[in-house]
Regions:
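A cross-family phosphate/adenosyl-ligand binding-site feature
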Residues: 6-221
Length: 221
């Protein structure tokens, strides 16, 4: 890793995915999630402050993205997958904060569906983007996020370690979004940073958490 005279990183590239994807059922309806993009944006700011070359792949977010960032806008899981696959080979770090839809509609209707009738829909799984990353770039430092709901600390950590096993992530940021003040869209969170070690971060602002995450990343790379 090369440093400039201020301690910043030269030519080191960070890719961050953020926000929630949207899967259309017809031209005006679809399914999405409550991801706000706040954590991804705080991580992007940390990367920028530390001198990295930052690119953001942005789905649906509730935050304003500063113009200093190179931004690629996407909507669906498929669009995000294509954008990531194109960029991953040239990146040094990928931080996957986006909440990507696990399912999409098998048949998207080209017209507005009649709301006066009962509706039965078929869903099929989307591609697990994070599981492709190490195949495309074995040398990349891969950071995953794992959001769980109403489970024990031990189970959250076990879930994070399972992602490491399945996707080859180098680091996983895990949390329980059912905790008070830690839900999607909140300004605070409580997380566990998991690899061979486990760093427990108590309830803190997402800005503070982003700073801690980057400190850990820089210890590992």
């Amino acid at each position: 890793i090369n440093l400039n005279k201020w301690g910043g990183f030269i030519h080191e590239k960070v890719l961050i995915s953020m926000g929630g994807t949207y899967e259309p059922i017809d031209p005006i309806r679809g399914i999405t999630n409550k991801s706000s993009g706040k954590m991804g944006l705080e991580l992007a700011k940390q990367a920028y402050i530390r001198g990295f070359d930052v690119t953001l792949i942005v789905a649906n977010v509730s935050v304003r993205i500063p113009s200093v960032f190179n931004v690629i806008k996407v909507e669906t899981a498929e669009e995000m997958n294509k954008a990531i696959k194109k960029l991953i080979p040239s990146q040094d770090i990928f931080i996957s904060t986006a909440a990507v839809s696990d399912f999409k509609f098998e048949d998207k209707d080209t017209h507005k569906i009649d709301s006066s009738k009962a509706l039965s829909i078929n869903l099929k799984p989307t591609i697990k983007i994070i599981r492709q990353i190490k195949e495309l770039n074995p040398d990349i430092f891969l950071v995953g996020f794992k959001a769980e709901v109403n489970i024990s600390k031990e189970d959250i950590i076990a879930s994070a370690k399972q992602q490491i096993k399945d996707a080859g992530t180098d680091l996983v940021i895990a949390n329980d979004v059912s905790d008070e003040n830690c839900h999607f869209g909140s300004d605070n969170n409580k997380v566990w940073i998991v690899d061979d070690d486990i760093v427990s971060v108590p309830l803190s602002s997402k800005k503070e958490i982003a700073n801690i995450i980057f400190d850990v990343i820089l210890e590992k790379i």
